[in-house]
């Protein structure tokens, strides 16, 4: 599989495909980076959604906004990975890079 396709697919189901590609990929730093960034980013969005669900009134208002931000982030990350770009999200991109051993 081409690196750009594998990188884009690592975002498809968020942390699920991110973890799968982390386990399967042994050589490509590009794929490992995008898989790690996907795992950290979208696991974070899931945790944030769960935390917001416990906050009365404001949480209900913020969950759709977080969902929209997550969806836009998801689309941008898939596009950038498919375009062979080492696109780093703020903060999360640096963490992902450190976790895979630097690029």
Swiss-Prot record:
Record's subcellular location: Cell membrane
Highest taxon of source: Archaea
Annotated GO CC locations: plasma membrane
Primary localization class, coarse: membrane
InterPro entries: DUF4870 (IPR019109)
Chain segments annotated as transmembrane: 5-25, 35-55, 58-78
Membrane topology: Multi-pass membrane protein
Cystine bridges: none
Keyword Membrane: yes
Keyword tags: Cell membrane, Membrane, Transmembrane, Transmembrane helix
Protein name: UPF0132 membrane protein AF_0105
């Amino acid at each position: 599989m081409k690196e750009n396709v594998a990188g884009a697919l690592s975002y498809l189901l968020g942390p699920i495909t991110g973890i799968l590609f982390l386990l399967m990929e042994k050589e490509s730093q590009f794929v490992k980076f995008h898989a790690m960034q996907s795992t950290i980013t979208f696991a974070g969005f899931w945790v944030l959604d769960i935390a917001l669900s416990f906050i009365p009134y404001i949480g209900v208002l913020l969950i759709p906004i977080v969902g929209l931000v997550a969806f836009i982030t998801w689309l941008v990350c898939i596009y950038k990975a498919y375009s062979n770009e080492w696109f780093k999200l703020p903060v999360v991109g640096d963490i992902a890079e450190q976790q895979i051993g630097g690029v």
